[in-house]
UniProtKB/Swiss-Prot annotation:
First-listed, main subcellular location of the protein, grouped into a coarse class: cytoplasm
Pfam family, one: DEAD
Induction line: By gonadotropin in Leydig cells. Inhibited by flutamine.
Domain of life according to the entry: Eukaryota
Gene3D superfamilies: 6.10.250.2170, P-loop containing nucleotide triphosphate hydrolases (3.40.50.300)
UniProt name for this protein: ATP-dependent RNA helicase DDX25
Post-translational modification note: Phosphorylated on threonine residues. The phosphorylated form is found in the cytoplasm but not in the nucleus.
This enzyme's EC code(s): 3.6.4.13
Described function: ATP-dependent RNA helicase. Required for mRNA export and translation regulation during spermatid development.
Domain (Helicase C-terminal): residue spans on this chain: 311-478
Reactions catalysed: ATP + H2O = ADP + phosphate + H(+)
């Protein structure tokens, strides 16, 4: 599990337990909603209309975030370099290699070790001394799924809570119901030995009458419900909040209304409240939002090492239609040794058609698309990771963040394009980046119609890489392909 793991061996069991936990929580028609996602499975389990299937399968940021948390089996050993910008450049910059150096409460140390974790991750080494400092320091941090950021801010909240004071002291905003529950599970596990510290969820369906005396010290919720609890129902006194966490900021600003609601909540907080913001990306819109909501922050950025195409051999095959593409795919399968493969389609219709064709020809195939619930997607990815299926056919929902060591081939059954029908360079990079990982060699095949050839040439020029034409009828040529 992504945000639970700090570097121990507890991951696989926790992943399985959380998969089970969420499958009991999420109703088929209550899957993550509102963030660009337009379709979910019908209530009877049937698939949606063909009109929906013709649309590009657009990535749902919140669903992807939850999916990555569910499928992570260990802490990500990030190759990113951590860049720290202090609000006071003259102050000494501290980092830690052990949890003991943080001088935590004994019950917190016990909770950390009971979870099976032993040392801070790379980003935690720099972030935790700032988050636990006295007086409190504000922080804006770029942190991707799997780097231990949820555990870090949960530790900060638990460290500042006074169990004897029975009112909300820490407030955490998450973009969805499911992500709020996920964070709460981390609080419950890490705070296992923190006697009399409790969590409350300000999420849809948790109806609390106006005037109720809320005695739980940590509140986790979505912006709309938290806003209602604070200003309409008067359940939370924001002037008493000591730690304010805004998680998944990039997802927040992608959701209509959430950024304004978050800012309104933040403006009612006391000046001495510690404010922490986390985002997987630092695009201009995210950065502008972060600067509006977090005053005088320290900043932690990940200087990302670019995905490289140097260890991926790229080919293209000219085809007339999708049946042509499928025949070319069969020829490639017949000519080279394949471990596991991921095949990307631009629409659900093509993904479903290809799945049926391959299954009828006896291939072990699984289909992954945005209409599935997050739990269904996590189950499919785990089966693929376990080798129960050798081919994963997917839309853009799987373009990034899913690492399977056995993947040796990526096929673009359709080239990724944007709404202007121009090449989507970033998606292309992340698609073929599913192979050639962990220092291994990989192969990428692009199945394209003749009229799409100019798009492929733009991709080749953009990445300054070589994409060779392959004759799918020349089996001798195919058999000579090496990783």
């Amino acid at each position: 599990m992504a945000s639970l793991l700090w570097g121990g061996d507890a991951g696989a069991a926790e992943s399985e337990r959380l998969n089970s936990h969420f499958s009991n929580l999420v109703h088929p028609r209550k899957n993550l909603r509102g963030i660009r996602s337009t379709t979910v499975p019908n209530i009877d389990g049937s698939l949606n209309t063909e009109e929906d299937d013709d649309e590009d399968d657009v990535v749902d940021l919140a669903a992807n975030s939850l999916l990555n948390k569910l499928i992570r089996q260990s802490l990500v050993e990030s190759s990113h370099r951590v860049e720290v910008l202090q609000k006071d450049p003259s102050s000494p910059l501290y980092s830690v290699k052990t949890f003991e150096e943080l001088r935590l409460k004994e019950e917190l140390l016990k909770g950390i070790y009971a979870m099976g974790f032993n040392r801070p991750s790379k980003i935690q080494e720099m972030a935790l001394p700032m988050m636990l400092a006295h007086p409190p320091q504000n922080l804006i941090a770029q942190s991707q799924s799997g780097t231990g950021k949820t555990a870090a801010f949960v530790l900060a909240m638990l460290n500042r809570v006074n169990a004897l004071e029975l009112f909300p002291q820490c407030l955490c905003l998450a973009p969805t119901y499911e992500l709020a529950l996920q964070t709460g599970r981390v609080v419950e596990r890490m705070g296992k030995f923190c006697v009399d510290v409790e969590v409350m969820y300000a999420i849809r369906g948790n109806r609390i009458p106006r005037g109720t005396d809320v005695t739980k010290q940590i509140v986790i919720g979505t912006p709309g419900t938290v806003l209602d609890w604070c200003f309409k129902r008067k359940l939370i006194d924001l002037t008493k909040i000591r730690v304010f966490v805004l998680d998944e900021a990039d997802v927040m600003i992608d959701t209509q209304g959430f950024s304004d609601q978050s800012i309104r909540i933040q403006r009612a907080l006391p000046s001495e409240c510690q404010m922490l913001l986390f985002s997987a990306t630092f695009e201009d819109s995210v950065w502008q939002f972060a600067e509006r909501i977090i005053p005088d922050p320290n900043v932690i950025k990940l200087r990302k090492e670019e995905l490289t195409l140097n260890n991926i051999r790229q080919y293209y095959v000219l085809c007339e239609n999708r049946k042509d593409k499928y025949q070319a795919l069969c020829n490639i399968y017949g000519g080279i040794t394949i471990g596991q493969a991921i095949i990307f389609c631009q629409t659900r219709r093509n993904a479903k058609w290809l799945t049926v064709e391959m299954m009828q020809d006896g291939h072990q195939v699984s289909l992954l698309s945005g209409e599935l619930t997050v739990e269904q997607r996590a189950s499919i990815i785990q089966r693929f990771r376990d080798g129960k299926e050798k081919v994963l056919i997917t839309t853009n929902v799987c373009a990034r963040g899913i690492d399977v060591k056995q993947v040796t081939i990526v096929v673009n059954f359709d080239l990724p394009v944007n709404q202007s029908e121009e090449p989507d360079y970033e998606t292309y990079l992340h698609r073929i980046g599913r192979t050639g990982r962990f220092g291994k060699k990989g192969l990428a095949f692009n199945m394209i119609e003749v009229d799409k050839l100019p798009l492929l040439m733009k991709i080749q020029d953009h990445f300054n890489s070589s994409i060779k034409q392959l004759d799918p009828e020349d089996m001798d040529e195919i058999e000579k392909i090496e990783y």
